[in-house]
C-alpha cells in the first residue's frame, strides 16, 4: 500500500536505497500480520516520513511489472507489484522518531518537479498515483472489507466461522 500525501500543492516523497540505486517513492510498504490495508498505510507513512497520516479515501488499486536484471548472486527477477494507494490528511511530524531503514530523506515536490524526476521513480506508479489524485479520483474506504480473521490470531480451518 502507498500513502499519496499532498499538502499545499506539493507531494511528500521518500528517497530510498534500492538495488537500482537511490530512488524516489511514495511512502509505501507491505502488510504486517494482523493489520488492515488502512492500518498498514498509516504505519508505513509514519515509519518512512515520521508524519502521522490519516487515510480518507482509496485513490486506486494499481499493478505494475518490474524486471530486475541478474546480478552476481541472483538470477533475473520478474516482479509484479500490487498497490493499494490511499490519500488523506497529513498529521504532525513526530519529533524524536527516525526514518525507517533504507530511507535517506523525505522531500516535498510540486507536480512539475515530480513529473521531471520520473527517471528516478521507483516505479511508474509514483507518477500515475499523483496524476489520478490531481484528477480528483477518490473512492470511499468502505470499498475495502477487512474480515475479523485478519485481526484474530487464532488459526481458522476452512469452513469455520470466525
Which sequence ranges carry the predicted segments?
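Residue-level recognition of beta-strand microenvironments
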Residues: 58-61
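Unchanged
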Residues: 31-54, 64-125, 156-161
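Short, surface-exposed beta-strand-loop junctions and turns on beta-sheet-rich folds
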Residues: 19-21
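Charged phosphate-binding loop/patch that engages nucleotide di/tri-phosphates or the phosphate backbone
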Residues: 129-162
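Short loop/turn segments immediately following the C-termini of beta-strands
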Residues: 16
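A short gly/proline-enriched turn/hairpin at secondary-structure junctions
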Residues: 24-27
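Conserved N-terminal beta-strand and adjoining loop/helix that marks the start
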Residues: 1-12
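Small-residue-enriched segments and motifs
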Residues: 1, 53-56
